[in-house]
């Protein structure tokens, strides 16, 4: 009988953390063993299951200083860049693999993550839903066929509390398009603002961003020519698709030794 993969979660009290824990407990191949919060958090020592409303599960909330080597097999982290880099240090120290769903990293921070992947296995993705990763493939194919004849725009919508813009997923869509078109995303992007903007440059990707209400996530890519327009849209109804993808990633990476991976590796796309 195969042992369950023991998973540690950072930010367990947040919306994503709660969803992850519920899905971990429902997955027959995984179970939660560590729920990590910041130092001196008022809920340290309490049962995380009771706190998130699923009843006691025997896992007490702890801070990062209490992570022990034998507590977990894989860490799932959806926090902020500075926190992720600290958790990477722990994983590297204890030779534990990590799944990173945090977005908003700088180029320098990405380079740090890449350096850690020489010592442990890391999965990093802007979006863990299977649907959005299929969308990446559709965008790639569409760009190959009509990209040179289209104005391309990315529209992304998220809840009012999201602090980074554009979203990591929108930027990844932009990278998919840029690679096909041989563009530089940083140089070949348009962020729409008020005022006289001038005629639209054909060889750039337009970004439009909405932050409102409780929108989980919606991404639309428009390919517009003089004769027709194609829209490809993915809408997340809730965060469960992200949670399932992250846990699938944790199970996949458990036995890996080193390397930097993404959802195309997990899904064999």
UniProtKB/Swiss-Prot annotation:
It catalyses: (S)-2,3,4,5-tetrahydrodipicolinate + NAD(+) + H2O = (2S,4S)-4-hydroxy-2,3,4,5-tetrahydrodipicolinate + NADH + H(+); (S)-2,3,4,5-tetrahydrodipicolinate + NADP(+) + H2O = (2S,4S)-4-hydroxy-2,3,4,5-tetrahydrodipicolinate + NADPH + H(+). The keyword Lyase does not apply. Keywords: Amino-acid biosynthesis, Cytoplasm, Diaminopimelate biosynthesis, Lysine biosynthesis, NAD, NADP, Oxidoreductase. It is found in: Cytoplasm. One of its GO terms (cellular component) is cytosol. InterPro entries: DapB_C, DapB_N, DapB_N_CS, DHDPR_bac, NAD(P)-bd_dom_sf. NADP(+) binds at residue 39. Disulfide bonds: none annotated. One of its GO terms (molecular function) is 4-hydroxy-tetrahydrodipicolinate reductase. It comes from the Bacteria. One of its GO terms (biological process) is lysine biosynthetic process via diaminopimelate. The keyword Ubl conjugation does not apply. NAD(+) binds at residues 11-16, 101-103, 125-128. Pathway: Amino-acid biosynthesis; L-lysine biosynthesis via DAP pathway; (S)-tetrahydrodipicolinate from L-aspartate: step 4/4. Its EC number is 1.17.1.8. It is an enzyme of class 1 (oxidoreductase). The active site is at 158 (proton donor/acceptor), 162 (proton donor). Catalyzes the conversion of 4-hydroxy-tetrahydrodipicolinate (HTPA) to tetrahydrodipicolinate. Homotetramer. PANTHER family: 4-HYDROXY-TETRAHYDRODIPICOLINATE REDUCTASE 1, CHLOROPLASTIC-RELATED, DIHYDRODIPICOLINATE REDUCTASE. Belongs to the DapB family. This is 4-hydroxy-tetrahydrodipicolinate reductase. The gene is dapB.
